[in-house]
Amino acid sequence: GIDVRLYSPVVRVSDGAVELANGDILTTETVIWTAGVKANPIVEALPVEKDKLGRVVVDEYLEIPAFPGVIAIGDCAHCWDARLNAALPPTAQVAIQQAHCVADNIMRGLRGEGEQPFVYRHRGDLVSLGAGDGVGEIAGMAFSGLPAWLLWRSVFLVKLFGWKNRIRVALDWIISSLFQRDLAKLEW
């Protein structure tokens, strides 16, 4: 059975047990942690409009309306997409596209050209589930298993900066597939 405990802060996770703030101890073999994240304290302290997650509200140029010329992107930015009628999720895919837009607009400004608004283009989703397994969706087509895992790894390598890093990561993956991980447990 699955025991879902909402609003039950965990104070300790040990081998085979989870202790809650109210003193309950749950014996278990598997723990799945689905906790949220908190906004960066610097972002929290900014005197600007924020959403319920603490993200700074930005306009279509990724600028903070109260501070023209000041830009917020990535996890700290609440970026509304009118086409989706929703805020964009705080994902790497969104952040990378925002960074490209900001860089392009800086270059446009240096050339005396006008800025272009940020337009998000969803490229799909890929998730590695480990050990040759994954799930994905690209252009409305869902797939899973080894093909999804291989595509995830391929995209990961392509997105790395520089050939040296790509080769190091690929070699690490090859070595890891040939040999078991060397784990050491420290007891105090």
What is each residue range found by the language model?
Residues 1, 38, 97-113:
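Flavin-binding catalytic cores
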Residues 16-19, 23-97, 104:
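FAD-site-proximal beta/loop scaffold in flavoenzymes
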Residues 4, 70-72, 126:
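Conserved beta-strand scaffold positions in the cores of enzyme catalytic domains, especially
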Residues 1-14:
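A conserved beta-strand/loop element that lines the FAD pocket in flavoprotein oxidoreductases
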